Design a protein with these regions (language model features):
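Alpha-helical, largely C-terminal catalytic domains
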Residues: 1-220
Length: 220
């Protein structure tokens, strides 16, 4: 849902078309390393995560809605501040939180209202992730990003269970904040996540958000 006429990959492609200038040793400058070039291309591609607004909020008429990156950042903070849990790698949770929606830099924020199946959504995102990792270059970092994304997508570890819960907690917390700030009623976000939390932490944090919502409603 980026506003630019060129896709993020188009932009990176244009950048990659230029040839590295010949820099003489007399100038005192050295040409940028290929790894630095790939890193900056990848980060440029990720820029749209900061500018693409989350579809669910747009569809509900929220003014100035959060971006995809906003959402992932607070999930990262959730993973940072959560207490130690048995057999859960908190550092892995932080990494997973900041990459779980990274493919949306290309495909955008696909919401249920778009009428796209979960299988097709996953296929598009995986293809986008492969393209992004090609930009970054094959190596340990690309493999780590793909592994983290797949683990989250498959919900195949305790870390993925927790981060998926944080995805929902962050959403309902944001919904509560928008209800307070903009006078909205955003029941659908709370209804769609009810009884879907997998971890004790997720259930406890969601219960706290819901309790605050109930209290806020009663005090009006």
């Amino acid at each position: 849902m980026a506003d630019d006429s060129l896709s993020p990959l188009d932009d990176v492609g244009i950048q990659n078309q230029r040839k590295d200038p010949d820099v003489s040793t007399d100038s005192g400058l050295t040409p940028p390393s290929s790894s630095a070039s790939r890193a900056i291309d990848f980060l440029t591609l990720c820029r749209s995560l900061k500018t693409t607004k989350r579809t669910g909020w747009i569809n509900n008429g929220i003014k100035g809605p959060e971006s995809i990156a906003d959402h992932m950042y607070r999930m990262g903070l959730m993973s940072l501040i959560v207490g130690d849990l048995p057999a859960v790698d908190r550092e892995r949770c932080i990494k997973m939180a900041i990459v779980h929606d990274i493919a949306e830099a290309i495909v955008g924020d696909i919401a249920p209202s778009d009428g796209i199946s979960k299988e097709e959504k996953s296929r598009r995102e995986e293809a986008a992730l492969e393209e992004m990792c090609k930009v970054l270059g094959e190596g340990t970092r690309s493999e780590e990003i793909k592994e983290l994304w797949r683990e989250y997508e498959d919900n195949s570890s305790k870390e993925a269970n927790l981060v998926k819960d944080f995805d929902k907690v962050e959403m309902i917390l944001q919904a509560l904040e928008y209800e307070k700030e903009q006078g909205k009623v955003l029941d659908s976000f709370f209804q769609s996540t009810a009884s879907k939390f997998q971890t004790d932490v997720g259930k406890a944090w969601a219960a706290e958000v819901n309790a605050r919502r109930t209290s806020s409603t009663q005090n009006k």
